[in-house]
Every structure is written in C-alpha cells, then in structure tokens.
Amino acid sequence: MRTIEGENELLLTCMETPDGVSVLRCETRDDDVRLPDEIGGAPVVSLGGYALSERAPDLTGRDTFRVRVTCGGPEPVHDANAIRAVTLSKRLQSVGSYAFYNCRRLETLTFSGSLTEFGGDALMNCRALRHIRLHADPAAPTCLHRVLGEHAGELDVIFLHGGARIRLLFPAYSEELETLAPAHIFQRRIHGAGYGYRQCFESGVLHFRGYDLALESLLDRHDFSVAARVAVRRLAAPYQLADAARAAYLDCLRAHGGALARDCAAAGESAALSFLLSLGVLSREDIAAACDTAREKEQTAALSVLLAALGQNIPKGRAKSFDL
C-alpha cells in the first residue's frame, strides 16, 4: 500500500484512468476532509459513487490499489457522520452518484471550476449542508447548478476568483407529489422561492440578472428575512449588479433590515452590522432595537458599533458586566 503525507488520515481505494486517478472509496473519521490533488504524480480526476458514504461501494472485479494518506495518526475506521467539510481535488472532473450518501453532518463542500459532472443523489441525506465554496470564475460555466439541484435546503455559496469573494444565498424549497384520485395521476407541487433561484443558469453559467429578479418572488411570499439576507450579500459584492437591482435590494433592506440587524447583533456579527449601517437603510428605531438585542446577548463589540451609529458610547459601568 502506498503512503503519502497529507492533512488527513485517509484510506483510499483507487483506480487508474486514462486521465489520472479515480478515488473509488475514501475511508476517514476526520471532520475536515481534503482529498489529495495528485497520487503518484497523476491528478485525481474523479470521485466514485458511494465514495464517502456510510455504505461502501461494491468494487468487485475492479483493478484497484490502496493509498494511505497520513499526517501521523492511526489508520482510520470510516465514520461518515464525523465528516463536516470536504474539499475536493483541484482537478476533479466528476463526482459519482451517492458519493456523500448519509454524510448527515456535512456542512461545507469546496470544489473548483474543473468539476463538470455531479451524480444524482450525491447529497442524499446531507441535510446539514449549508455552505458551498467554489473556486471558479462566476462568469464561466460551472457545476454549481447541478450541485444546487441535488440539495433543496438553503445554501450559502461563495465564488472565490482572483482575490474576489462573491457571496450568494440560494433559498430553500420543498416539493411534494399529490395523487389526483381516481385517475392516480401525480401532480408535483413546489413550495418556496428556492426552486426559482436554482433556475437562474444558462448552459451552466449563473445569470445574475435572473438571480436578482428572483427577489420579487421572495417578497411576494413574505420571506422577508431570507430576502434581507439575499440583499445584503449582493450589495456587499455587487458583481454584475444593475442599478435597478441595487435599488430594489436597498428598498428591501429599508423595509426589512431591522430584523436582520437584530439577528446580527444577537450573533455578535460586528462586521456585518458595520456594512449594514454603511448602507444607510436602518432607521434610528431599527438601530436602537438592535442595541437592546446586543445588550441582552452581551455582545459588546456589536453594541459598540451600534451605539457609535447613534452617536453614543457604551456606559463604562455596563461594559464591565460583559464577558470579553
């Protein structure tokens, strides 16, 4: 068995392909898994079906070899539930069906623009997934639309390209099949604006104008909290943001930014509060309410930002009561 140094304890079952190496199985109990970019000088180009899943794939008859990736720890016994984050190989081209099946605690998936195929049900039962990190040009075709199509939950997506960070929110949606008796015809019903957001792609390229127009559907559904979070992300990194869309996002935050400010205050997100305040969309009442929340949650840094916006300072006596 080959052994290579890495950032994890992984036990890989691999197969050579014309383009490089395919990882058919990855056994680990690490929470942050980083697949190697190369094995034996050849690029890792595919991740097989069920590769990281709770269930092992049937590799009978395959011409495989094993690779131990180690950072000095013991040989791992696979635990799909331990996995919280996965970074795919830089030149990975395909992910097989059910690759992450029953990775129930998987929260973050990172991949590059080289990924072009994403198998059906690859994310089945990955209900904790919330973050996608994509190293790619947002103006180029990517596999993002396929990944989004495999997960109906809310996803926070970040494009990382040339030093830029373009952050987008794709809302959740749900669907159900309703039987129309007595003909036993099934009618598909979709609930939530997230499905519409997932249709904003043309030939694999995200259509930012279509994404921005989808804000109206969130407001029509009274999903004001989600709409505010969509708005603040687009305004923070206004890639291909038209003037009309910018105005719509600012109007959204004038109407619903107060609740977002309170959420940020409760979580101690000072940087987010500073940006929200810089937009000039919060009323003094909104800021005062966020101050009350920050005091209640003992978020001193957030309270400082908010009080500065009101032209006040934290009373020294109260500041001492916080756990800094």
Indicate residue ranges for each PLM-predicted region:
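Consensus positions within tandem repeat domains that build extended binding/scaffold surfaces
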Residues: 50, 96-98
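Ankyrin repeat arrays, specifically the small/polar loop and inter-repeat linker segments at the C-terminal end
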Residues: 242-256, 281-288, 301, 311-323
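TPR/TPR-like alpha-solenoid helical repeat scaffolds
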Residues: 291-299
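Ankyrin repeat structural motif
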Residues: 268-277, 299-308, 315
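Structural signature of tandem-repeat unit edges
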Residues: 2, 7-20, 27-45, 56-94, ...
